[in-house]
Amino acid sequence: MSDRLTCPHCGHTLDRYDQPRLTVDAVVRNDDGDVLLIKRRNPPLGWALPGGFVDVGETLERAVARELNEETGLSARSVTQFHTYSDPARDPRHHTVSTVFLVDATGEPEANDDAILAGYFPPDALPAPVVFDHARIIADVVHGHVTSGG
């Protein structure tokens, strides 16, 4: 999808394209295999993996470590790329493409920034609602493979 932009000074016209927004999500598991989730402060309201938008000039790995720290206070020791999810319907706000990382982290989770709560939950007993496609991502991680679709 595009629309035309016209410079108000010189009259030059160019196309502006809507593009997907790049995001990252962190899957952090404790020694019992429970998954870290945050309760979101902003819509869509519900529970989600820690994560967010990649800043200009930032690597995916740095972005996931930053978002994890901002939302939970945890520090990433190591990050391993798991899969990239790109279903245009995965985020009700706009088309996002999210790279998911398995993260080994230190510290105790404490809600900050966009999170009002943070805690670990068994993958088979997640709180409701889990927003975006994060329940699917968690299932993919638990089963060690990605289900069909994007």
Identify the residue ranges that each predicted region occupies.
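Acidic, metal-coordinating catalytic segment for phosphate/diphosphate chemistry
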Residues: 1-25
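A short coil-to-beta-strand element that immediately follows conserved catalytic motifs
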Residues: 74-83
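Conserved hydrophobic "DFG−1" position in protein kinase catalytic cores
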Residues: 28-29, 37, 103, 120
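Active-site-adjacent beta-strand/loop module that shapes the phosphate/pyrophosphate-binding cleft
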Residues: 85-109
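Residue-level preference for beta-strand/loop junctions
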Residues: 6, 20, 45, 77, ...
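NUDIX/MutT-family hydrolases
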Residues: 100-102, 110-143
